[in-house]
Amino acid sequence: MNQNLNLSPTAAPMPVQSPAVRRRNFEEVALGYDEITAMEEARRCLGCPGAPCRGGCPVGVHIPQFIAKVAEGDFAAAWEILSADNPLPAVCGRVCPQENQCQAVCVRGKKGESVAIGRLERFVADWHRAQQEPKAPSCAEEKGKKVAVVGSGPAGLACAGELARMGYSVTIFEALHTPGGVLAYGIPAFRLPKDILHEEIAGLEKLGVTIQTDTVIGRTIPVEELLKDGFSAVFLGSGAGLPNFMGIPGETLCGVFSANEWLTRINLMHAAEPGAATPLMPAKQVVVVGGGNVAMDAARCALRCGAEVTIVYRRGREELPARAEEVEHAEEEGITFRLLTNPVEILGDENGFVTGIRCDTMALGEPDESGRRRPEVVPGAQFTLDCDAVIMAIGTTPNPLLHRTTAGLAADRRGRLTTEEGSCRTSLPGVFAGGDAVTGAATVILAMGAGRKAAQEIDEYLRKNPSH
């Protein structure tokens, strides 16, 4: 046995801002490991020969190898291993749900807590960022071919980075004024500081990736025009940014927001800051509908804007889809959870402003097709919550613009682009797609995995079709 192995059954805790302090600022909640803590946690890794953790990583990071280098204190080598497969390690170390992926299959987790893989990933990425002259990844010899990437979210960034390393000339087309996609507009700074996102994107630009913002492909430039304009292939990674609503009375009242709008105003338009050009309405009592990570983000932002916040969710605590860590942080900060609660109407005054939300009390019945117990209405148990703002955080779907403006580009009835089974190939030759645009809203790391897979398929396609 390795004499330096750390046999502790528990992972090193993550230092965080105290709830009383952080509930009134947008600074990062988690503070990160120091070198000693990172090395001690890394020594908990058994270095399993079969590396089940790597199989649980959508981008295939060589997890035991990079952790072994952390244990040795060779952080530069750890970075080389980590960054070879993950172009956004500082992002993933903060927002990836490792507990459901790599850490879920960690052998140490069978008799205690899993190795804190995500925290170690974050540590290595932050250590690298702190170096005066961080080393840029190397690229293969230029292939003399151009590839267009539509969307600069996780899928697009991962695809672009992989292609650039292969030697392709890559241009990303982004509809917004700043790159990052959902990483920029959807995740608050207290979970993902924007300077970290910008630095990781700058790392891709050092590989030669060009980013063209304020360009809506499908409207400003048709997809077909990209192929005619010298691009040998196109990757569609436009995400799923169209918010869902419940279709209940009152959703058009003043004070009803989609979580997308609420978070975009705060993250991109700085609406929570004094003197903002597009300020948020000064809500005092906010109800957030939904139980996922987006609901937690919207609720915690509303809290930091000075409101009392209640999250309503139609199932129980065990069924909450948000990360356990995010739920715990929200509760620590003073957010109220009303579980087994389903809105049926948003109430308003004679001027059209929100005054409350009427809800049914629910009970859990038999499992539905998702495997979760189906929520059923409890008769005679309806009630009303007073509020002056409601935020709908019940999911998103892909924007139909691309398939509606591109002849022959197939999509399903939900607007998700369709691809060949097990592949990223769309119905159009030379056009590939992946991430939320194909699957619907999912996780950052799954989108990145799809982007990497698409890059490999594009490379294979162009090798087989050298005339393109």
Regions found by a protein language model. Name each.
Residues A298, A437-N465:
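A conserved FAD-binding loop/helix module that cradles the flavin
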Residues A77, E141, K146-V150, H198-I248, ...:
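Feature captures the FAD/FMN-dependent oxidoreductase FAD-binding
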Residues P87, G153-A155, T178, G292-V294, ...:
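Residue-level detector of alpha-helix initiation sites
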Residues S169-I172, L176-L207, I211, A299-E345, ...:
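Rossmann-like dinucleotide-binding cores of NAD(P)H-dependent redox enzymes
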Residues V124-E141, E199-R219, P243-C305, D412-G422, ...:
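Glycine-rich dinucleotide-binding loop and its adjacent helix/turn
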Residues K146-T171, A295-L303:
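N-terminal Rossmann-like FAD-binding beta1-loop-alpha1 element of flavoenzymes
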Residues G55, G60-C139, E205, T213, ...:
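Glycine/serine-rich phosphate-binding loop and adjoining beta1-alpha1 elements at the start
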Residues T252-A283, P367-A441:
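FAD-site-proximal beta/loop scaffold in flavoenzymes
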